Amino acid sequence: MKKIFLALIAAAFTLASCDMDKSPEGSTTDTDALNSVEKCKSFRNGLYTYMRSVTTGGFIILSEIQLDDFHAVRGNSNRLMDFYNGNILATTSEVASIYGGYYSVIAGTNFLINGVEERIETGFYPQDSRHELNRYLGEAYFIRAFSYSNLADKFCGSYKHAEDLDKEGLGLSLQTTYAPTGDNTTYPGRSSLRATYNLILSDIGKADSLLSLYEENY
């Protein structure tokens, strides 16, 4: 009897270990998140959720507080006075949130753009799905351009001389591939203003072409 009991315990652990090797039912991983047009649509919808987070709250208000239209009064309780007084540092938590927020959106667009384009090249999707995929790609390119444009507006100075355009370090860190890592040294340093705006204009051009193709066949 004891041997039978031990055998049942061993079998239970074996079954449990097998279940642990499986992904939870209904879950999606990086490798299969774009494995159908419907999944691409779901991921694209998620990009608009990210967009809502970077087009409200501090992403909008903090810039307005620095303008002449805002007047601090006693009832303000000293909130956001660092921005009102121009005492803004790289360590200011609101600054880090804005910077990280836009790059989170960019990471999502890179995942969609890289993944869908790679699958299109290998003929992974049905031929008749290209029309719909053009829409998702076009929107992703526009959202990436929008994010980089807002980052440039907030974290890059305006150039005063033509030679400033090509100076390294005056632009943004430009990441166009999805390669998340905890090692910050693997990410590119700040580029030039020319490279930054060239990428923004290139993404806008691709978005326009892809969305025009979609609308022509709508």
Write out the residue ranges for each language-model feature.
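Short alpha-helical hairpin
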Residues: 68-90, 174
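Short, intrinsically disordered, charge-balanced linker/junction segments flanking boundaries
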Residues: 45, 198, 212-218
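Short, surface-exposed recognition loops and adjoining beta-strand edges that mediate ligand/DNA contacts
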Residues: 34, 60-69, 127-128, 155-172, ...
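Conserved, well-structured interaction surfaces
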Residues: 80-156, 187, 191-194, 206-216
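Extended ligand-binding groove/face enriched in aromatic
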Residues: 139-182
